[in-house]
UniProtKB/Swiss-Prot annotation:
Protein's name in the database: Acetylglutamate kinase
Chain sites annotated for binding substrate: G41, G42, R63, N155
Phylogenetic classification of the source organism: Bacteria, Pseudomonadati, Acidobacteriota, Terriglobia, Bryobacterales
Family annotation (Gene3D superfamilies): Acetylglutamate kinase-like (3.40.1160.10)
Enzyme class: transferase
E.C. number: 2.7.2.8
Function description: Catalyzes the ATP-dependent phosphorylation of N-acetyl-L-glutamate.
ATP-binding in keyword set: yes
UniProt key word S-adenosyl-L-methionine: no
Sorted UniProt keywords: Amino-acid biosynthesis, Arginine biosynthesis, ATP-binding, Cytoplasm, Kinase, Nucleotide-binding, Transferase
Involved pathway(s): Amino-acid biosynthesis; L-arginine biosynthesis; N(2)-acetyl-L-ornithine from L-glutamate: step 2/4
Family: Belongs to the acetylglutamate kinase family. ArgB subfamily.
Length: 257
C-alpha cells in the first residue's frame, strides 16, 4: 500500500516519540508498504528564531517569512529537523532519504501573499522522484520547503505539502500523526469517522478552528484529489501507526462519503 505519513513538529521535538515513530515507519516499510514521510518543525523554528532574537510573526496562522526567516527555514526544516529524522529512520532500519520540495521540482509553489513574504502556495508537483525511491525500497523524507522555476524558495504549510505529495504519489492513505487525539465535536469528544460533508459542517459551525480547521481543509483537498482515506491521529499513542495499519480505529478517519 502507498502511504503518506505526515509527522507534526511537536512529536519530533520529543526524542522518545521520534524514536518510536521511526521504528513504526521502518516496520511499515519492512512489511511492504511504500512510505513517504512529510514533516513539520514549527516548534523547532520558533525556538531557533527566538535564540537569535528574531520575532516570530503569524498572519492567519501562517508564519511571516522574511529574508532572515527563509534562511532559517532552510537551516531548520530542510536542515536539522530533516537530517535528524533521516538519521533516526536509518538507525531504525529504514533506508531514508532526506528531501525538500525543491529537489527535482518535487513540489512547486508561488508566493501566496506579499504580506506574508516568502510563504508559498502549492502550484504543482512532480512525483517521479518519490516513485523512483519508494519502488527501490527507500523512504523519502520531505521537508516543507518548495520552489518555483525561477529559483525562488518558499516556506510551505506542512499539511499542504503532505496533501501535494500524497496526491501526486497516488497514496491510498494520508495519515496525519499529530499531538491531538483526533477531530473533536462540540462536546469535546473524538469523532471516530467523518465524511467530507460532516467535516465541512464542523468548519462552518466554528467547531473546528485554528490548526484543526487547517488540517480538515487539507484532508478535504486530499480526498478531492483521490486519496481514499485520511486519518488524523495521536502520534504519541503507543504503536499508533502500526495499530492504524492493522485496522484499529485510532483518532479520526475521514472518507469521501
Amino acid at each position: 500500500m502507498k502511504l503518506l505519513v505526515k509527522l507534526g513538529g511537536t512529536l519530533l521535538d520529543s526524542a522518545a516519540s521520534r524514536d518510536s515513530l521511526c521504528l513504526q515507519i521502518a516496520a511499515a516499510r519492512a512489511a511492504g508498504h511504500e512510505v513517504t514521510v512529510v514533516h513539520g518543525g514549527g516548534k523547532q523554528m520558533t525556538r531557533y528564531l527566538t535564540d537569535r532574537g528574531i520575532e516570530s510573526r503569524f498572519v492567519g496562522g501562517l508564519r511571516v517569512t522574511s529574508p532572515d526567516t527563509i534562511d532559517a527555514v532552510l537551516k531548520v526544516f530542510a536542515g536539522s529537523v530533516n537530517h535528524e529524522l533521516v538519521a533516526n529512520l536509518n538507525r531504525a532500519g529504514a533506508l531514508a532519504v532526506g528531501l525538500s520540495g525543491i529537489d527535482s521540482f518535487l513540489v512547486e509553489a508561488e508566493q501566496m501573499d506579499p504580506e506574508l513574504g516568502a510563504v508559498g502556495r502549492v502550484t504543482g508537483s512532480n512525483p517521479a522522484l518519490l516513485h523512483l525511491l519508494t519502488a527501490n525500497g527507500y523512504v523519502p523524507v520531505v521537508a516543507c520547503v518548495a520552489g518555483d522555476r525561477l529559483g525562488q524558495i518558499y516556506n510551505v504549510n506542512a499539511d499542504q505539502m503532505a496533501v501535494a505529495c500524497a496526491s501526486a504519489f497516488g497514496a491510498c492513505r494520508l495519515i496525519f500523526l499529530t499531538d491531538v487525539d483526533g477531530v473533536m465535536d462540540n462536546s469535546n469528544r473524538v469523532r471516530p469517522v467523518l465524511t467530507a460533508a460532516e467535516s465541512r459542517q464542523l468548519i462552518d459551525e466554528g467547531i473546528a478552528t485554528g490548526g484543526m480547521q487547517a488540517k480538515l481543509n487539507a484532508a478535504l483537498s486530499a480526498l478531492a484529489d483521490g486519496v481514499q482515506q485520511v486519518r488524523i491521529a495521536p502520534g504519541a499513542a503507543p504503536g499508533a501507526l502500526q495499530r492504524i495499519l492493522a485496522g484499529e480505529e485510532i483518532g479520526t478517519k475521514m472518507v469521501t462519503a
